[in-house]
Amino acid sequence: MQTPTARSSTNVYGKLVDNETRCFHYHSKADVVALRCGQCEKFYACFQCHDELNTHPFLPWRKAKFHIPCVICGACKNSLTVEEYRSTVHCKYCNHPFNPKCKNHAGYYFEDA
């Protein structure tokens, strides 16, 4: 399933359960982040959604591309770079809290984690 974001034509893929990028795997109130695969460069609700829907594994966003947004806030649909995302516990645009447990999966999403 794919959902176009409100602020751009960027699609978010995955086993989505709502229009704020929550998915079958992660669906708490704070699970509103979609992340970009370093291989196909598409945004997915989580690495598990990606891997279940593709023939290639989710690869982390390369450090050389950290200046390019690779995170979408599902609440407001704005994009963030790795550093913008890592530097806060909530969206800098809409103030929606991010799930602090996502840090446990950082290695799946960002090359240097």
Curated annotation (Swiss-Prot):
Record: residues binding Zn(2+) 1: 23, 25, 46, 49
Any one Gene Ontology BP term: protein import into mitochondrial intermembrane space
Zinc-finger ranges (CHY-type): 16-96
PROSITE patterns per UniProt: ZF_CHY (PS51266)
MF-aspect GO terms: GTPase regulator activity; zinc ion binding
Keyword Metal-binding on entry: yes
PANTHER family: HELPER OF TIM PROTEIN 13 (PTHR28082:SF1), ZINC FINGER PROTEIN (PTHR28082)
Name of protein: Uncharacterized protein C29B12.12
Keyword list, A-Z: Cytoplasm, Metal-binding, Nucleus, Zinc, Zinc-finger
InterPro entries the record matches: Mito_Tim_assembly_helper, UCP017292, Znf_CHY, Znf_CHY_sf, Znf_LIM
Source organism: Schizosaccharomyces pombe (strain 972 / ATCC 24843)
GO CC entries: mitochondrial intermembrane space; nucleus
Keyword Ribosomal protein: no
Compartments, record wording: Cytoplasm; Nucleus
Positions with a binding annotation for Zn(2+) 2: 73, 76, 91, 94
